[in-house]
Regions:
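Short S/T/G/P-rich N-terminal loop/turn motif that feeds into the first structured element of a domain
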Residues: 1-56, 64-71, 97-99
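C-terminal structural segments of small proteins and small subunits
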Residues: 66-92
Length: 99
């Protein structure tokens, strides 16, 4: 199984707006499970750490293989979510690995 992990840090904005953006992003990501068959499992977590190096959101998703990850990457619903991510995310880190 292939694990795809993405950690994101949102752009600096007022606390309430950041909270709204995080909730919207989490909702958009969680909805992908309903549209992309190759996506076998997905978890979205919102950070509660106050460390200055902490990211704001983590996405953990599982795929059978690299073909499934590619189907996810180019799927219209995922591309739509990426458009929102580009608007609100300042930094993202990705790790893909086999389990």
């Amino acid at each position: 199984m292939l694990q795809h992990i993405v950690m994101m840090k949102l752009k600096a904005v007022a606390a309430e707006l950041k909270k709204e953006r995080l909730e919207k992003l989490a909702s958009l990501l969680n909805d992908l499970k309903n549209h992309i068959p190759a996506l076998q499992k997905m978890e979205v977590g919102l950070n509660f750490s106050t460390r200055p190096t902490a990211m704001d959101l983590v996405l953990s998703s599982s795929f059978k293989d690299e073909v499934g990850l590619e189907e996810y990457r180019v799927h219209l619903k995922h591309v739509e979510v990426l458009t929102y991510i580009k608007e609100v995310v300042e930094e993202a880190r990705v790790v893909d690995y086999w389990v």
